A protein has these predicted regions:
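Walker A/P-loop
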Residues: 12-48, 71
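A short beta-strand-to-loop transition that corresponds to the Sensor-1 phosphate-sensing loop
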Residues: 89, 129-138
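Loop/turn-to-beta-strand initiation segments
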Residues: 80-85, 124-132
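Pre-Walker A adenine-sensing motif
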Residues: 2-13
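A short helix-turn-beta junction within AAA+ P-loop NTPase domains corresponding to the substrate/partner-engaging
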Residues: 143-159
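Short glycine-rich substrate-engagement loop in P-loop NTPases that contacts/grips substrate
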Residues: 47-79
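Conserved catalytic/switch belt of AAA+ P-loop NTPases
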Residues: 91-127, 143
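C-terminal alpha-helical "lid" subdomain
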Residues: 161, 166-264
């Protein structure tokens, strides 16, 4: 869906709408998979968080998009660089009419501008730079923005097999895919969102860094930063022979933390 949407928008007399809204459960890899797919096909990504669209002043919400949009058009004209705008957590942006999102003059300007951009793209002689909107639930988006011709929808709800492949990709530089113990760990925790495993990977890096700080016996902060940087924690992690055991330990630790939060 991602590649078809992007390529289709660059075609002459494109039948594709400007916006593709990808929705699905939180933490299941929508952003990771979208950006990874773009990277695989050499598509430049202009990434924007939904929070960045909540400026304090009128038109603040579209300023960042407009400037980058002009840059993307020029890059395509000069160097044939295909690009896409990815707006993350769009369901939390001011384009939403959810009760939890305050509506302002800025909100009305943004939704109006987005609709106008989609409509103008059909007749513009300029290259069309497509948009991918990511979010958990788009049922509260301003209805005219989502009509046919402006926006397509795609639900991202990976099955267990797909989830396992994505999780393996997160760890592919450290653990072989055919490692049985690692496969067992994933299967045992497959009900957890993909973001859970991404955080496990981050926890492992933090543990390596903590170990290096303790073992260095250095008490100057600047020298500590230089020492840890020069030791390349990523390389250290790859050399760990107990990597799967380390992953299991981090999984158990994070599960305990989650259980503790639920009881509060």
């Amino acid at each position: 869906a991602v590649v078809s949407h992007i390529i289709g928008n660059y075609m002459k007399n494109s039948p594709y709408p400007l916006y593709l809204a990808i929705h699905g459960p939180k933490g299941e890899g929508k952003t990771f998979q979208t950006i990874r797919t773009c990277s695989k096909y050499n598509i430049a990504v202009y990434y924007i968080s939904g929070a960045e669209l909540c400026g304090s002043y009128e038109k603040d919400s579209i300023t960042a998009i407009e400037k980058n949009l002009d840059d993307a058009i020029e890059e395509y004209k000069k160097s044939n660089i295909v690009s896409v705008f990815v707006i993350d957590d769009f369901h939390l942006s001011i384009a939403s009419i959810s009760a939890g999102v305050s509506r302002t003059v800025n909100s009305q300007i943004l939704t109006g501008w987005l609709m106008n951009l989609a409509d103008r793209a059909k007749s513009s002689t300029q290259p069309r730079i497509p948009f991918i909107l990511l979010g958990n639930d788009f049922s509260n988006l301003y209805d005219p923005l989502t009509r046919d011709g402006r926006m397509d929808f795609f639900e991202w709800r990976p099955d267990e097999s797909t989830k396992k492949k994505i999780i393996c990709r997160h760890f592919e530089d450290y653990v072989p895919r055919d490692n049985r113990e690692f496969s067992r760990l994933i299967d045992a925790n497959i009900n957890q969102p993909i973001s859970f495993f991404a955080e496990i990977k981050n926890d492992m890096f933090k543990e390596i860094i903590s170990e290096q700080i303790v073992s260095s016996h250095e008490y100057d902060a600047l020298r500590l930063i230089q020492n840890v940087d020069s030791s390349h924690p990523d390389t250290v992690l790859k050399k760990r022979r107990d990597l799967v055991a380390m992953i299991e330990e981090q999984i158990n630790s994070r599960l305990i933390s989650l259980e503790a939060k639920e009881t509060i």
